[in-house]
């Protein structure tokens, strides 16, 4: 009977994956009534069938030539009233003595007069309390056998199905009188369009499928297999005859078990396989025809699918949908699973799938003619072939797509429907995932294991899972993955409610909300488990595939959707795409705009988890275990790898480096950082954030606004971390790399670290500037970006690795409570400079020297004085910024904090002339001339504690400096006269005196020269010679110019205006004018001025007496003015005379020689 067409096996395998079918199979009773009704009403098919069933004038007799292999037994004994002499219009089953009691007990009275209705009623009885007697069973068996082989029934079939038979050549050629005609029509039932013929054959099918022995040819094909699998142990006798459906069920289980074993002990023969699958196909529309499943699930059908209309496989689908309900009986669940496994082997076992997709299978050549026999009917191939058409943009009917969705969901829901999973993952399932068989939990458990969260999985199992994910394609519709669907339902309802249900962008939306408050933990796990596989096959992201398939084919040499290349590693195509996504126009071969946007979207989403980057996880697995085993929180693993970049294996380092380089161009890849920085981006960087092409602008903006009030800790830490990573390689700063690439190759070859490149380039720029080179070696665009990088590095000591390494121990010792950032650590080190270790001290000194030459690099000064710079120095050059601020320091509009910071920098400058570039330039001739002795003792990179400046101050008092140097020293003297802290030598030598004699003045918030005045007044109380010398030097300086004596200048300001306005300031001219005015009795000075002048005269007089001689002239003057002048002169004269006398008396010391020897 069953000459299997080649297409059947292909459709079979596909059905294994569908888990949520809603169709149901027609129950025989559903059609019998109408047919009989039509028989009474006059339908030819109905009348003839009814008449035939009633025209059996005698009970069915045993026909030896047609007995099946397992005979039903001898004919029943003739009972009264059942023979030809029976009443009514012919022989009736209900009147047979052997069945009368059973019919009366089981069947409704209105069916008794119709043999087919009685037959249907009795053969569907399975309850123990209603069990049919053995004699009645035997009678029914022979009656059905006669029906299937009776030539009269065949003649009815030929009449009712005349046009159908002419269309189906196979049936027209069947021999007459052997029952093959009806069997052939049953075989082609799906192709019968004639209504009456279809109804007739449906009735006959119900009779034939009630017992495997009635299926023509089935016994011949499966006899040996029945014995081999021991499926024939169910004998007729006391048991229900209709349990013969168990034999077919047993064979089906043997068939699916064989597919799940590597080396099956028992193999079903090919002929029997075809027969089993064909029986399953023919019972696909009416679940009543699968006798084992019908009896196993009859109660469950009433419970779950009571309102489901029978026919076209709807009952099957409804039961599939409820397979994992708690109240589903275990025997029904097992029967449904077996049915689903058969669908996986032959898609035609699913009536609705085969019917809905028939035209599409033919249209896209997914049918028999194109494929090797082993694959043609498998559900997996059908799904892959049709999904490939969908992904290529071809039209597949909505009915077919709906069926595909159901069966893809079915495969994802129950791992046991995929023989490859059972074969390859049996050990892993037993070890890691036992007891998780329902609702897709086992598959997700295996996914979790593969992600490395619970152990390792074999490659075969991993490959089987990857294949299953491709077959089911849950990336196209999240609902296919039931475990994910249930876990993420709440998130979808809140975060993704604006997206249509089933849209592929739902998964994208979930990824965007990963690690947010809206995400729930269970959804997070299920999502990452699925994304792990999607990330390894670019085709599994339908939006990416649709928009990039052209680019992938052109640039990455990809295959079709359902073709794979074993030579291509996981994630290789996507890696290829993102390499081309960030190419410039000059580099060529770029992606289309749509594809580029998709690649960026996925990059942004997947960067949150290293496991979603196959190449990264593969190459860095050892390094992750070695360096980052404790970094388990979100995003920490990649940060950890970046932190240990120099320690990583070469392959891992290259991948991490490339990814970091990519991040520098498009920082939005750092999705967690972007999420943390969202408020700052919205407030300060929305312009650059909206740009489709980032090119490093967004990170630059975040760095510039890192210390805004709105900045949160997570964002600041993230930005700083990225800055620290950038220091490891100049390629990690995209804008710097693009602006200076050529300059680095030319001027700084073989230099990798960013800080070294910055130093190299900035040194070149500085040298060219100092040497006033006609043309800078560093290009203009590079110089501009170099300035940005230099400014960014000043913000955090960690961004200057050499300084940081040199000062680590000092930071722990003196700045342990100070936070990084805002240059706070650097400022702390400056304040504790005297206590620093030698190496750190030298580095800090070098830093200060650089900052004084270029104040814009002084982050703290620029930050504190930002508004004052805008107010007072908007036009000032970066190198003259501090000079400008100093000039406006005493303005009433000057901010106190900025003024304090300027004073700090002045104090620093006055500790060493090298920290004052203006002074250094103005006095470059004077310093070696007058202070050579100090310079010879000085060491590089250590302060001179103001010795050179003190030396120049003394020469200023003697009016011996050059005019430029004199101007600068005058400013320094004026400033230090107002604030003692600006005189390092005074601070150094008079610290005890200030603390003891002038504590109140020193504590004043505003320094206006009170401390200096206090020291002058208390000069006689000072015991320390060095301090006394410093005070005397101050007095000497003030004598040179009134401007350097703020107290005196303030007291005499009006007098200078009235009496000395015409006198040019400088070189003591105005001071001399005031002294003359004091001596002139005609001039009346202000009382305060007069008092201060008299005090100064006394001080100068005392200073002249006690001050040490600076030179020979000073020494001669001191002798001449000394009260012991005569005594000193006498001693000197006597000494000379004694020396002369000794010479006369002792003669020459050298030996006499002749003139000749002298002249020789």
Curated annotation (Swiss-Prot):
TM annotation in the entry: 1127-1147
Signal peptide (from-to): 1-18
Keyword Acetylation included in the entry's annotation: no
Residue ranges that the UniProt entry lists as topological domain Extracellular: 19-1126
Its membrane topology: Single-pass type I membrane protein
Presence of keyword Signal: yes
InterPro entries reported for this sequence: Cys-rich_GLG1_repeat, Cys-rich_GLG1_repeat_euk, GLG1
Glycosylation sites: 146, 191, 562, 658, 767
Compartment(s): Golgi apparatus membrane; Golgi outpost; Cytoplasm, Cytoskeleton, Microtubule organizing center
Cys-rich GLG1 repeats: 97-130, 131-193, 196-259, 267-327, 328-394, 395-454, 456-518, 519-585, 590-649, 651-709, 710-769, 777-837, 839-892, 893-960, 961-1016, 1022-1082
Comp. bias intervals (Gly residues): 80-91
Composition bias type Low complexity, residue spans: 52-79
GO cellular component, one term: microtubule organizing center
Stretches for region Disordered: 52-94
Residue numbers bearing the Phosphoserine modification: 942
Keywords: Cytoplasm, Cytoskeleton, Glycoprotein, Golgi apparatus, Membrane, Phosphoprotein, Repeat, Sialic acid, Signal, Transmembrane, Transmembrane helix
PTM statement from Swiss-Prot or TrEMBL: Fucosylation is essential for binding to E-selectin. N-glycosylated. Contains sialic acid residues.
Residue ranges that the UniProt entry lists as topological domain Cytoplasmic: 1148-1160
GO molecular function: fibroblast growth factor binding
Function: Binds fibroblast growth factor and E-selectin (cell-adhesion lectin on endothelial cells mediating the binding of neutrophils).
Protein name as annotated: Golgi apparatus protein 1
Biological source species: Cricetulus griseus
């Amino acid at each position: 009977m069953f000459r299997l067409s080649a297409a059947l096996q292909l459709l079979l395998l596909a059905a294994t994956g569908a888990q949520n079918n809603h169709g149901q199979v027609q129950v025989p009773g559903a059609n019998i009534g109408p047919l009989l009704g039509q028989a009474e009403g006059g339908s030819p098919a109905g009348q003839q069938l009814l008449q035939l069933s009633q025209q059996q004038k005698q009970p069915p007799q045993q026909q030896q030539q047609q007995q099946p292999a397992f005979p039903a037994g001898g004919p029943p004994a003739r009972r009264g009233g059942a023979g030809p002499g029976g009443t009514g219009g012919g022989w009736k089953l209900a009147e047979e003595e052997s069945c009368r009691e059973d019919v009366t007990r089981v069947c409704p009275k209105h069916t008794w007069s119709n043999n087919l209705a009685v037959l249907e009623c009795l053969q569907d009885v399975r309850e123990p309390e209603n069990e049919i007697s053995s004699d009645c069973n035997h009678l029914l068996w022979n009656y059905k056998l006669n029906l299937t082989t009776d030539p009269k029934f065949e003649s009815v079939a030929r009449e009712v199905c005349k046009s159908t038979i002419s269309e189906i050549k196979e049936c027209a050629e069947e021999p007459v009188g052997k029952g093959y005609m009806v069997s052939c029509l049953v075989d082609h039932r799906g192709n019968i369009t004639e209504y009456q013929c279809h109804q007739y054959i449906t009735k006959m099918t119900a009779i034939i499928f009630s017992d495997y022995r009635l299926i023509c040819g089935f016994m011949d094909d499966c006899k040996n297999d029945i014995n081999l699998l021991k499926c024939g142990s169910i004998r007729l006798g006391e048991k229900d005859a209709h349990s013969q459906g168990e034999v077919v069920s047993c064979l089906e289980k043997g068939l699916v078990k064989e597919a799940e074993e590597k080396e099956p002990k028992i193999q079903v023969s090919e002929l029997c396989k075809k027969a089993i699958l064909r029986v399953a196909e023919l019972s696909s529309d009416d679940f009543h025809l699968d006798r084992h499943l019908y009896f196993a699930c009859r109660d469950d059908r009433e419970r779950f699918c009571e309102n489901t209309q029978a026919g076209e496989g709807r009952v099957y689908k409804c039961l599939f949908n409820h397979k994992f309900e708690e109240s589903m009986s275990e025997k029904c669940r097992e029967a449904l699973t077996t049915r689903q496994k058969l669908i996986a082997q032959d898609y035609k076992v699913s009536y609705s799938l085969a019917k809905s997709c028939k035209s599409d299978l033919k249209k896209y050549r997914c049918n028999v003619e194109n494929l090797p026999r082993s694959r043609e009917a498998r559900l997996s191939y059908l799904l892959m072939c049709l999904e490939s058409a969908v992904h290529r943009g071809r039209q597949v009917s909505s009915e077919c797509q709906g069926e595909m969705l159901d069966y893809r969901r079915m495969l994802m829901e129950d791992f046991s429907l995929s023989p490859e999973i059972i074969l390859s993952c049996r050990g892993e399932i037993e070890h890691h995932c036992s007891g998780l068989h329902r609702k897709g939990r086992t598959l997700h458990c295996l996914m979790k294991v593969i992600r490395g969260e619970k152990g390792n999985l074999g490659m075969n199992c991993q490959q089987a899972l990857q294949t299953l994910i491709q077959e089911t394609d849950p990336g196209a519709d999240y609902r296919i993955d039931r475990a994910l669907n249930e876990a993420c339902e709440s998130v979808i309802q809140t975060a993704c409610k604006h997206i249509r249900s089933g849209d592929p962008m739902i998964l994208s939306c979930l990824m965007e909300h990963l690690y947010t408050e809206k995400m729930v933990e269970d959804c997070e796990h299920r999502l990452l488990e699925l994304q792990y596989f999607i990330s390894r096959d670019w085709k599994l992201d339908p939006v990416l595939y649709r928009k990039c398939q052209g680019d992938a084919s052109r640039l990455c040499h990809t295959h079709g959707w359902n073709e794979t290349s074993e030579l291509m590693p996981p994630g290789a195509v996507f890696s290829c795409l993102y390499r081309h996504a960030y190419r410039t126009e000059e580099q060529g071969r770029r992606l289309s705009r749509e594809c580029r946007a998709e690649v960026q979207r996925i990059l942004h989403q997947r960067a949150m988890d290293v496991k979603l980057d196959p190449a990264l996880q593969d190459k860095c697995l050892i390094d992750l275990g070695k360096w980052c085993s404790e970094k388990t929180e979100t995003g920490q693993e990649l940060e950890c790898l970046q932190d240990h970049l120099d320690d990583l294996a070469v392959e891992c380092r290259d991948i991490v480096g490339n990814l970091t380089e990519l991040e520098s161009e498009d920082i939005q890849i750092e999705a967690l950082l972007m999420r943390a920085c969202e408020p700052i981006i919205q407030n300060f960087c929305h312009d650059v954030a909206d740009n489709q092409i980032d090119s490093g602008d967004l990170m630059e903006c975040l760095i510039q606004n890192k210390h805004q009030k709105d900045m949160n800790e997570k964002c600041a830490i993230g930005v700083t971390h990225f800055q620290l990573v950038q220091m490891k390689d100049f390629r990690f700063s995209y804008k710097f790399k693009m602006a200076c690439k050529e300059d680095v190759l030319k001027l700084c070859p073989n230099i990798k670290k960013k800080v070294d490149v910055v130093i190299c380039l900035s040194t070149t720029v500085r040298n060219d500037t100092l040497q006033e080179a006609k043309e800078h070696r560093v290009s203009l665009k590079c110089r501009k970006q170099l300035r940005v990088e230099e400014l960014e590095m000043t913000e955090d000591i960690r961004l200057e690795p050499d300084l940081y390494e040199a000062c680590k121990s000092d930071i722990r010792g003196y700045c342990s409570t100070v936070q990084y950032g805002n240059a706070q650590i650097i400022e702390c080190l400056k304040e504790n400079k005297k206590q620093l270790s030698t190496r750190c001290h030298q580095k800090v000194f070098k830093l200060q020297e650089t900052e004084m030459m270029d104040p814009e690099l002084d982050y703290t000064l620029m930050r504190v004085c930002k508004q004052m710079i805008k107010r007072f120095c908007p036009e000032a050059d970066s190198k003259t910024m501090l000079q400008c601020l100093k000039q406006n320091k005493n303005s009433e509009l000057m901010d106190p904090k900025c003024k304090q910071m300027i004073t700090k920098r002045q104090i620093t400058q006055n500790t060493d002339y090298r920290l004052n570039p203006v002074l250094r330039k103005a006095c470059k001739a004077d310093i070696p001339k007058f202070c050579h002795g100090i310079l010879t003792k000085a060491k590089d990179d250590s302060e001179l504690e103001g010795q050179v400046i003190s030396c120049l101050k003394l020469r200023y008092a003697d009016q011996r400096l050059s005019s430029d140097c004199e101007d600068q020293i005058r400013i320094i003297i004026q400033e230090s006269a107002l604030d003692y802290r600006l005189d390092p030598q005074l601070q150094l030598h008079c610290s005890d005196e200030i603390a003891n004699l002038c504590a109140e003045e020193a504590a004043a918030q505003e320094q206006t020269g009170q401390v200096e005045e206090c020291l002058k007044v208390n000069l006689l109380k000072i015991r320390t010679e060095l301090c006394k010398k410093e005070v005397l030097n101050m007095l000497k300086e003030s004598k040179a110019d009134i401007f350097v004596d703020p107290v005196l200048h303030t007291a005499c300001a009006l007098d200078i205006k009235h009496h000395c306005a015409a006198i040019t300031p400088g070189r003591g001219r105005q001071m001399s004018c005031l002294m003359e005015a004091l001596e002139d009795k005609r001039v009346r000075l202000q009382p305060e001025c007069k008092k201060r002048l008299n005090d100064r005269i006394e001080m100068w007089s005392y200073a002249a007496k006690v001050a040490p001689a600076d030179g020979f002239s000073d020494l001669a003057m001191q002798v001449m003015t000394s009260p012991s002048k005569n005594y000193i002169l006498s001693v000197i004269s006597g000494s000379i005379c004694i020396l002369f006398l000794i010479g006369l008396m002792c003669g020459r010391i050298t030996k006499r020689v002749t003139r000749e020897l002298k002249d020789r």
